Swiss-Prot record:
It comes from Enterococcus faecalis (strain ATCC 700802 / V583). The gene is vanYB. Its cofactor is Zn(2+). GO terms for molecular function: carboxypeptidase activity; metal ion binding. Zn(2+) binds at residues 188, 195, 241. This is D-alanyl-D-alanine carboxypeptidase.
Length: 268
């Protein structure tokens, strides 16, 4: 009987040791898996945040000049000329009836996520992004400048999408053109328009669109294709598409409830 009890105790001890070892192994496996997942998520978060950032805007102009005229009167005249020049390029109208001028040229700046924009709108877009983040909203530039070839590619994809739904070629083309501009008539080809979406981690699309709708004008941007202006713009509602027109024009457009076509008609 004592021998039997001895063996029983030994077996019980072995089972206990085995179970304890299994628990420790499971615990270590959990800790390692949790650590790996945490590191991966941290890496992804940093990657996304880097992709949302615009390149730093230099505090001073890097050209050879000082940027300040010796004669105050000359400086005032230069400022007035710059404002006039900005109105000329920032208010250019591009739509189905007004294609991009044949000799139109643009100097581009590449953002940290690879998208490009007209270098002249860069500081305003940076200010917009900084203000949004300060309010707890995290946007990204999903699309900036496009070449003619890229615009054609997007158009072809949209036409194919409608054809797959059973539309004829003519119907598919007509429907696609309410969403995608015909190459040569897209504001993206100006470098003045950006499609802005949410980062997908800190903000939702609706949060970003709402913030932009209420605040973008303060930085010179307008919601180019609002839902109640489709008959005028010829483009369906796009809450992500924003166009730089300058702070003065954007403020008037916002407060008067206009689209760019209407604003330009009132300014004639």
């Amino acid at each position: 009987m004592e021998k039997s009890n001895y063996h029983s105790n030994v077996n019980h001890h072995k089972r206990h040791m085995k179970q304890s070892g299994e628990k420790r192994a499971f615990l270590w496996a959990f800790i390692i898996s949790f650590t790996v997942c945490t590191l991966f998520l941290g890496w992804r978060l940093v990657s996304v945040l880097e992709a949302t950032q615009l390149p730093p805007i230099p505090a001073t102009h890097t050209g050879s000049g000082t940027g300040v005229a010796e004669n105050p009167e000359e400086n005032t005249l230069a400022t007035a000329k710059e404002q006039g020049d900005e109105q000329e390029w920032s208010l250019i109208l591009v739509n189905r009836q007004n294609p991009i001028p044949a000799q139109y040229d643009v100097e581009l700046e590449q953002l940290s996520n690879g998208e490009r924009i007209d270098i002249r709108i860069s500081p305003y877009l940076q200010d917009l992004f900084d203000a949004a983040r300060a309010d707890g909203v995290y946007p990204i530039v999903a699309s900036g400048y496009r070449t003619t070839e890229k615009q054609q590619e997007i158009m072809d994809e949209k036409v194919a999408e409608y054809k797959a739904k059973g539309y004829t070629s003519a119907q598919a083309k007509a429907e696609a053109e309410t969403w995608v501009a015909v190459p040569g008539t897209s504001e993206h080809q100006l470098g003045l328009a950006v499609d802005i979406n949410a980062d997908g981690i800190h903000s939702t699309g609706n949060e970003v669109y709402r913030w932009l709708d209420e605040n973008s004008y303060r930085f010179g941007f307008i919601r180019r294709y609002p839902p109640d202006k489709t008959e005028i713009t010829g483009v369906s509602n796009e809450p992500w598409h924003y166009r730089y027109v300058g702070i003065e024009a954007a403020t008037k457009i916002y407060h008067q409830g206009l689209c760019l076509e209407e604003y330009l008609n009132t300014e004639k």
